[in-house]
Amino acid sequence: MSQAQDDLRDLERLAVELAQLAGDRIIASLGTALAVKYKKLSREEEAEAEFRDPVSEIDSAVEAVLRERLAERYPTHAIIGEEEGGGDLPPGDYTWVIDPVDGTANFVNGFPIFAASIGLVHKGDPIVGAVWCSTSHALRPGV
């Protein structure tokens, strides 16, 4: 196996580990009262919108943990998160893209179809990803 293949496997393992961590945190929160906010919309959207794009405290907490783990392991990689956006690092060769609770509206309303998603993009091309699924607790990695 080449060094590049080993590196991809390491990145895939990390994506799987973090997706599982997100899933574990989400499961631990089930049945608890959640604080929910709604994302700010543009003026045009706001005029037409009712409550949409919820963000739970679990979304924010899980994203914070994932960001912390990624920054410890790969401090030069950029991170784009569903809740916090692009952060302080400018996009570089490697950018992690995370959605800590993909399907928050379902999650906060007790509808059990949601996921945790994490992926890595290298120079604009997706190279690694992992998705944890709420209905089966299955992890789906991809390189």
Language-model region placement:
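N-terminal subdomain of lithium-sensitive/metallo-dependent phosphomonoesterases centered on the IMPase/IPPase/PAP
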Residues: 1-101
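DPxDG-like acidic metal-binding loop motif
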Residues: 90-143
